[in-house]
Amino acid sequence: MAQKINPLGFRLGVTQNDRSHWFAQQRNYSKDLREDQKIRTCIENYVRTHIKSSSNYGGIARVEISRKIDLIQVKIYIGFPNLLLIEGRGFQGIEKLKNDVLNMLDSVDRKLHIAIEKVAKPYRKPNILAEYIALQLEKRVPFRKTMKKAIELAEREEVEGIQIQIAGRLDGKEIARVEWDRGGRVPLQTIRARIDYCYYPVQTIYGVLGIKIWILEE
Protein backbone atom coordinates (compact mmCIF):
# COMPACT_ATOMS: atom_id res chain seq x y z
CA MET A 1 0.00 0.00 0.00
CA ALA A 2 1.34 3.44 -0.92
CA GLN A 3 2.69 5.58 1.93
CA LYS A 4 1.30 9.11 1.57
CA ILE A 5 3.41 12.08 2.64
CA ASN A 6 2.83 15.82 2.48
CA PRO A 7 4.68 17.10 -0.62
CA LEU A 8 5.72 20.32 1.14
CA GLY A 9 7.18 18.61 4.20
CA PHE A 10 8.85 16.04 1.93
CA ARG A 11 10.79 18.86 0.20
CA LEU A 12 11.35 21.13 3.21
CA GLY A 13 14.88 22.49 3.08
CA VAL A 14 15.34 21.40 -0.55
CA THR A 15 12.84 23.36 -2.64
CA GLN A 16 10.45 24.55 0.10
CA ASN A 17 11.04 26.97 2.97
CA ASP A 18 9.35 27.31 6.36
CA ARG A 19 6.29 29.57 6.60
CA SER A 20 7.21 30.64 10.16
CA HIS A 21 10.61 32.03 11.11
CA TRP A 22 11.28 32.27 14.84
CA PHE A 23 12.85 30.57 17.84
CA ALA A 24 11.13 30.01 21.17
CA GLN A 25 11.90 28.49 24.52
CA GLN A 26 10.38 25.07 25.08
CA ARG A 27 7.72 26.33 27.48
CA ASN A 28 6.54 28.98 24.94
CA TYR A 29 6.77 26.95 21.75
CA SER A 30 3.22 25.56 21.75
CA LYS A 31 1.74 28.98 22.61
CA ASP A 32 3.58 30.70 19.74
CA LEU A 33 2.61 27.91 17.36
CA ARG A 34 -1.08 28.31 18.25
CA GLU A 35 -0.74 32.08 17.81
CA ASP A 36 0.62 31.57 14.30
CA GLN A 37 -2.40 29.45 13.41
CA LYS A 38 -4.77 32.05 14.88
CA ILE A 39 -3.08 34.83 12.89
CA ARG A 40 -3.41 32.91 9.63
CA THR A 41 -7.04 32.03 10.34
CA CYS A 42 -7.85 35.65 11.25
CA ILE A 43 -6.29 36.92 8.01
CA GLU A 44 -8.13 34.36 5.86
CA ASN A 45 -11.47 35.14 7.53
CA TYR A 46 -10.91 38.89 7.17
CA VAL A 47 -10.15 38.64 3.45
CA ARG A 48 -13.20 36.42 2.83
CA THR A 49 -15.43 38.84 4.76
CA HIS A 50 -14.20 42.02 3.06
CA ILE A 51 -13.99 40.96 -0.58
CA LYS A 52 -15.56 43.43 -3.00
CA SER A 53 -18.22 41.15 -4.46
CA SER A 54 -19.46 37.60 -4.22
CA SER A 55 -17.68 36.71 -7.48
CA ASN A 56 -14.25 37.47 -6.02
CA TYR A 57 -12.20 35.26 -3.72
CA GLY A 58 -9.38 35.96 -1.31
CA GLY A 59 -6.43 34.89 -3.41
CA ILE A 60 -4.02 34.34 -0.51
CA ALA A 61 -1.05 32.30 -1.72
CA ARG A 62 0.66 32.03 1.68
CA VAL A 63 1.28 33.88 4.94
CA GLU A 64 4.78 34.09 6.40
CA ILE A 65 5.33 35.02 10.05
CA SER A 66 8.56 36.05 11.76
CA ARG A 67 9.00 37.05 15.38
CA LYS A 68 11.38 39.16 17.40
CA ILE A 69 11.27 39.98 21.11
CA ASP A 70 8.27 42.33 20.98
CA LEU A 71 7.53 42.43 17.25
CA ILE A 72 5.50 40.12 15.00
CA GLN A 73 6.09 40.59 11.28
CA VAL A 74 3.50 39.17 8.90
CA LYS A 75 3.92 39.06 5.13
CA ILE A 76 0.84 38.20 3.09
CA TYR A 77 1.44 36.94 -0.44
CA ILE A 78 -1.80 37.64 -2.27
CA GLY A 79 -2.80 37.43 -5.91
CA PHE A 80 -5.35 40.25 -5.80
CA PRO A 81 -4.21 42.86 -3.22
CA ASN A 82 -6.94 45.32 -4.20
CA LEU A 83 -9.41 43.08 -2.36
CA LEU A 84 -7.99 44.40 0.92
CA LEU A 85 -8.75 48.01 -0.04
CA ILE A 86 -12.22 48.64 1.31
CA GLU A 87 -14.47 51.13 -0.53
CA GLY A 88 -11.54 53.12 -1.90
CA ARG A 89 -10.24 54.13 1.52
CA GLY A 90 -6.66 53.24 0.71
CA PHE A 91 -4.82 51.12 3.23
CA GLN A 92 -7.35 51.62 6.02
CA GLY A 93 -8.43 48.07 5.28
CA ILE A 94 -4.98 46.81 6.24
CA GLU A 95 -5.03 48.90 9.42
CA LYS A 96 -8.37 47.36 10.36
CA LEU A 97 -6.92 43.90 9.71
CA LYS A 98 -3.97 44.78 11.94
CA ASN A 99 -6.31 45.87 14.74
CA ASP A 100 -8.37 42.68 14.39
CA VAL A 101 -5.26 40.52 14.73
CA LEU A 102 -4.02 42.45 17.77
CA ASN A 103 -7.42 42.17 19.45
CA MET A 104 -7.47 38.44 18.72
CA LEU A 105 -4.00 38.03 20.27
CA ASP A 106 -5.12 40.08 23.30
CA SER A 107 -1.64 41.57 23.68
CA VAL A 108 -0.83 45.23 24.30
CA ASP A 109 2.93 44.96 24.79
CA ARG A 110 3.79 43.68 21.30
CA LYS A 111 3.91 45.38 17.93
CA LEU A 112 2.51 43.97 14.71
CA HIS A 113 3.68 44.81 11.21
CA ILE A 114 1.74 43.57 8.18
CA ALA A 115 3.15 43.75 4.65
CA ILE A 116 1.34 42.88 1.43
CA GLU A 117 3.28 41.22 -1.38
CA LYS A 118 1.55 40.85 -4.76
CA VAL A 119 1.97 37.51 -6.50
CA ALA A 120 2.96 38.17 -10.11
CA LYS A 121 1.25 35.07 -11.51
CA PRO A 122 -1.52 34.13 -9.05
CA TYR A 123 -2.74 31.02 -10.86
CA ARG A 124 0.66 29.38 -10.41
CA LYS A 125 -0.22 29.08 -6.70
CA PRO A 126 -2.31 26.04 -5.67
CA ASN A 127 -4.06 27.86 -2.80
CA ILE A 128 -5.49 30.46 -5.18
CA LEU A 129 -6.56 27.83 -7.70
CA ALA A 130 -8.17 25.80 -4.91
CA GLU A 131 -10.20 28.84 -3.84
CA TYR A 132 -11.34 29.29 -7.43
CA ILE A 133 -12.40 25.63 -7.68
CA ALA A 134 -14.19 25.80 -4.32
CA LEU A 135 -16.16 28.86 -5.44
CA GLN A 136 -17.27 27.09 -8.63
CA LEU A 137 -18.28 23.94 -6.75
CA GLU A 138 -20.34 26.01 -4.30
CA LYS A 139 -22.18 27.41 -7.33
CA ARG A 140 -22.86 23.83 -8.52
CA VAL A 141 -20.69 24.11 -11.62
CA PRO A 142 -19.86 20.56 -12.85
CA PHE A 143 -16.61 19.41 -11.28
CA ARG A 144 -15.07 18.17 -14.55
CA LYS A 145 -15.66 21.53 -16.23
CA THR A 146 -14.20 23.26 -13.17
CA MET A 147 -11.05 21.13 -13.20
CA LYS A 148 -10.53 21.70 -16.94
CA LYS A 149 -10.89 25.47 -16.48
CA ALA A 150 -8.46 25.49 -13.53
CA ILE A 151 -5.88 23.56 -15.56
CA GLU A 152 -6.28 26.07 -18.41
CA LEU A 153 -5.71 28.99 -16.00
CA ALA A 154 -2.55 27.35 -14.66
CA GLU A 155 -1.21 26.51 -18.12
CA ARG A 156 -1.65 30.15 -19.18
CA GLU A 157 0.77 31.01 -16.37
CA GLU A 158 3.29 28.62 -17.95
CA VAL A 159 3.47 25.95 -15.26
CA GLU A 160 5.27 22.73 -16.12
CA GLY A 161 2.48 20.55 -14.79
CA ILE A 162 -0.60 20.48 -12.58
CA GLN A 163 -2.65 17.72 -10.97
CA ILE A 164 -6.06 18.26 -9.36
CA GLN A 165 -7.97 15.79 -7.19
CA ILE A 166 -11.48 16.25 -5.82
CA ALA A 167 -13.04 13.77 -3.37
CA GLY A 168 -16.53 13.55 -1.90
CA ARG A 169 -20.14 13.37 -3.09
CA LEU A 170 -19.43 14.78 -6.53
CA ASP A 171 -22.47 16.20 -8.37
CA GLY A 172 -24.61 15.12 -5.41
CA LYS A 173 -24.18 11.37 -5.99
CA GLU A 174 -24.97 9.21 -2.95
CA ILE A 175 -21.65 7.36 -3.03
CA ALA A 176 -18.51 9.42 -2.49
CA ARG A 177 -15.66 8.97 -4.94
CA VAL A 178 -12.35 10.48 -6.00
CA GLU A 179 -11.82 12.12 -9.39
CA TRP A 180 -8.67 13.72 -10.72
CA ASP A 181 -7.23 15.39 -13.80
CA ARG A 182 -3.73 16.36 -14.84
CA GLY A 183 -1.97 18.61 -17.32
CA GLY A 184 1.74 18.29 -18.06
CA ARG A 185 4.05 16.30 -15.79
CA VAL A 186 4.01 16.16 -11.98
CA PRO A 187 6.91 14.00 -10.65
CA LEU A 188 5.78 13.51 -7.05
CA GLN A 189 8.65 11.15 -6.18
CA THR A 190 11.42 13.57 -7.24
CA ILE A 191 12.57 15.55 -4.20
CA ARG A 192 14.34 18.26 -6.18
CA ALA A 193 11.20 18.93 -8.26
CA ARG A 194 9.81 22.32 -7.24
CA ILE A 195 6.27 21.16 -6.49
CA ASP A 196 3.80 23.32 -4.59
CA TYR A 197 0.77 21.71 -2.95
CA CYS A 198 -2.36 22.53 -1.00
CA TYR A 199 -5.40 20.81 0.47
CA TYR A 200 -8.62 22.83 0.60
CA PRO A 201 -11.95 21.58 2.02
CA VAL A 202 -15.16 23.18 0.78
CA GLN A 203 -18.66 22.88 2.23
CA THR A 204 -21.39 22.27 -0.35
CA ILE A 205 -25.08 21.40 -0.04
CA TYR A 206 -24.11 17.74 -0.58
CA GLY A 207 -21.43 17.69 2.10
CA VAL A 208 -17.72 18.45 2.36
CA LEU A 209 -15.52 18.06 -0.71
CA GLY A 210 -11.75 17.82 -0.43
CA ILE A 211 -9.62 19.56 -3.08
CA LYS A 212 -5.95 18.69 -3.55
CA ILE A 213 -3.69 20.48 -6.04
CA TRP A 214 -0.08 19.79 -7.02
CA ILE A 215 1.75 22.28 -9.27
CA LEU A 216 5.20 21.82 -10.79
CA GLU A 217 6.63 25.35 -10.98
CA GLU A 218 9.85 24.66 -12.89
UniProtKB/Swiss-Prot annotation:
Domain KH type-2, chain residue ranges per copy: 47-120
Keywords: Chloroplast, Plastid, Ribonucleoprotein, Ribosomal protein, RNA-binding, rRNA-binding
Principal cellular location given in the protein's record: plastid
GO CC entries: chloroplast; cytosolic small ribosomal subunit
A Pfam family assignment: Ribosomal_S3_C
Swiss-Prot/TrEMBL GO biological process terms: translation
Subcellular location: Plastid, Chloroplast
Domain of life: Eukaryota
A GO molecular-function descriptor: structural constituent of ribosome
PANTHER family linked: 30S/40S RIBOSOMAL PROTEIN S3 (PTHR11760), SMALL RIBOSOMAL SUBUNIT PROTEIN US3C (PTHR11760:SF19)
Assembly, per entry: Part of the 30S ribosomal subunit.
Protein family: Belongs to the universal ribosomal protein uS3 family.
Protein name in UniProt: Small ribosomal subunit protein uS3c
Organism annotation: Picea abies (Norway spruce)
